[in-house]
A protein has these predicted regions:
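Acyl activation and transfer enzymes in specialized metabolism, enriched
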Residues: 93, 99, 123-147, 214-231, ...
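Flexible, non-catalytic linker and terminal segments flanking ANL/adenylate-forming cores
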Residues: 64-103, 162, 288, 398, ...
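Extended, hydrophobic beta-loop-alpha segments that form or line the acyl/peptidyl-thioester binding
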Residues: 143, 147, 224-233, 346-353, ...
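His-Asp-centered acyl/peptidyl-transfer active-site segments
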Residues: 85, 107-116, 133, 144-146, ...
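Short amphipathic alpha-helices and their capping loops
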Residues: 67, 74-111, 133-178, 197, ...
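Acyl/amide activation-and-transfer machinery of modular secondary-metabolite enzymes
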Residues: 100-123, 155-175, 195-200, 209-211, ...
């Protein structure tokens, strides 16, 4: 405003020189009105400035409160990502203590890692081999955990360190097609986790085919299962953007909060409740024929039931929250195990894999149970209070998100166990032009070599508006078909029992029902 006032003065001087001198009285009269006019203008401006200041202050306070009430994700996306990437760089330079569940898993396997491996077959004419190798390297370097090493300190704690200077070897070997079936036993080996690579990649080239063998340290705490890996490998081959992996940042944040009471209580829960020397697998049939026990291939007995009533009840109690469907499935397994043991196993255990990633009811596969996360419940006197039972399992589940965070930032939906069991669609037709042949996958032989048995019971739940299916897979090595049939019959009854008494606070005598 000051600059405009000066311009006005200059304009007045021009007017005077143009029309000649005026009388002193006229000048004084003019100056009087001029000063009055200027005073009014200045006063108006000051009032306007004051009004704007007060209004902006009120608005700023309102925006501050609104900003504080919003999550960090509502900030400027570019700046937020930049800050997260900077923190991730710091995390990658740190030696970090791994989650209690991962420590449990490593120690329980006697320091031998149970891995899930795959060997796939692709026609050479359907793939650019050099491009495939470049995509493989890009995928590896996109996931820091694949370039990391584990270390055990004197205090017994296990740490992980990012070591890009020690990349995994990618072996390329020429081979004859007829020799592929004989590779299986040679490829299987025990991973000694400390100061050694956590992955094994080999490309076998015959005259007509490329055989790709990939074996990756597999545990639900690191987010790098073979299913995620193959999806990212496919994206890299197609020159698509790969999701950022914030595994180390999540682990860094966990380490930063280790001294807080919240984390202390969670860590102590693991130490107090999970016996590293205990085998949490359910009891097996003792009279399985030796030829089945010693068979090296994975054989499954598949059982399934569908129920419209179950679908309605699940939606009634859990709505659109898939995590609560896992609670139901866990309750069902624990209760069925207790009854299956003729009420002798009062502390049955379910091992929960939490394999569904970012899924919703709409993606159909809302629950998968496998072997990693032991959930224990104590039954006694052949009775159960369903309401108390639910609240306890829910409480145990609430601990899980504090320790295990899915590291990738994307919206794709994964159901790892289904992909593994069905063994279909390992790469899209866009990847290689034609369907690939899966030679073999996941074998119990590696469990035997590492002195560790996968829980031979896998469960899945599918639900949508048209159908609900509850499926179980029993390992034929440890269950006779008659035993699997009995277990499934019990599960059908227990699922109905849980749903019918979900909000009933009373003891139910199980002996009278089973």
């Amino acid at each position: 405003m000051e600059e405009e006032f000066v311009s006005g003065q200059k304009y007045d001087e021009i007017e005077i020189s143009k029309y000649g001198k005026k009388s002193n009285k006229a000048k004084e009269e003019k100056n009087k009105y001029k000063q009055a006019f200027i005073s009014i203008i200045i006063s108006s401006i000051l009032i306007l400035i004051l009004f704007i200041f007060i209004h902006s202050k009120i608005k700023t306070n309102h925006l501050t409160e609104e900003f504080q009430s919003k999550s960090q994700s509502k900030l400027n996306e570019k700046d937020a990502i930049s800050d997260k990437d900077k923190l991730n760089e710091i995390a990658l330079k740190s030696k970090l203590r791994i989650y209690p569940l991962a420590q449990y898993f490593l120690k329980r396997t006697n320091y031998a890692l149970l891995n899930i491996f795959n060997l796939i077959k692709i026609k050479k004419e359907d793939i650019d081999i050099n491009r495939f190798i470049l995509a493989l390297n890009k995928t590896i370097y996109n996931h820091p955990v694949l370039l990391s090493r584990f270390y055990e300190e004197d205090d017994g704690e296990i740490y992980i360190e990012y070591r890009p200077d020690l990349p995994p070897e990618i072996k390329i070997i020429k081979i004859k097609d007829e020799d592929i079936p004989n590779l299986k036993d040679n490829l299987l080996h025990i991973y000694k986790p400390f100061n050694s690579s956590l992955v094994n990649f080999t490309i076998f080239l015959s005259d007509d085919y490329l055989y790709f063998f990939y074996d990756i340290f597999h545990s639900n705490f690191d987010g790098n299962s073979v299913i995620i890996f193959k999806n990212n490998l496919e994206a890299a081959y197609l020159n698509k953007t790969l999701p950022k992996d914030y595994f180390f940042l999540n682990l860094y944040n966990y380490n930063q909060n280790l001294k807080s009471e919240k984390y202390k209580s969670t860590v102590n829960f693991y130490k107090e409740n999970f016996d590293l020397t205990r085998d949490y697998c359910p009891k097996f049939d003792e009279d399985i024929p030796e030829n089945i026990k010693n068979n090296k291939s994975l054989q499954l007995i598949y059982k399934e039931y569908s129920s419209e009533e179950l679908r309605q009840q699940l939606r009634k109690y859990f709505g659109e929250k898939p995590k609560y469907y896992n609670i139901f499935m866990t309750m069902n397994i624990l209760l069925a195990n207790y009854i299956y043991s003729d009420f002798k196993d009062e502390n049955p255990t379910a091992k929960i894999g939490f394999n569904g990633r970012n899924w919703t009811i709409d993606s159909n596969s809302v629950g998968c149970l496998i072997y990693n996360y032991p959930v224990i419940y104590h039954f006694e006197n052949k009775v159960v209070n369903i309401k108390t039972f639910y609240n306890k399992i829910k409480e145990l589940f609430e601990l899980k998100p504090k320790l295990m965070k899915y590291p990738f930032e994307h919206t794709e939906r994964y159901s790892s166990m289904m992909s593994i069991i069905q063994t279909k669609g390992f790469f899209s037709s866009e990847f290689a032009g034609k369907k690939l042949e899966l030679i073999y996958f996941y074998d119990n032989l590696i469990n035997m070599k590492s002195n560790y048995l996968m829980t031979p019971l896998m469960e899945e739940l599918f639900i949508d508006d048209n159908i609900t299916k509850y499926s179980s897979f029993f390992d034929a090595k440890f269950y006779k078909k008659s035993s699997a049939d009995r277990f499934m019959d019990i599960q059908i009854k227990t699922s109905k029992l849980i749903m019918e008494n979900f909000d009933v606070d009373k003891d139910i005598n199980l002996e009278n029902l089973f």
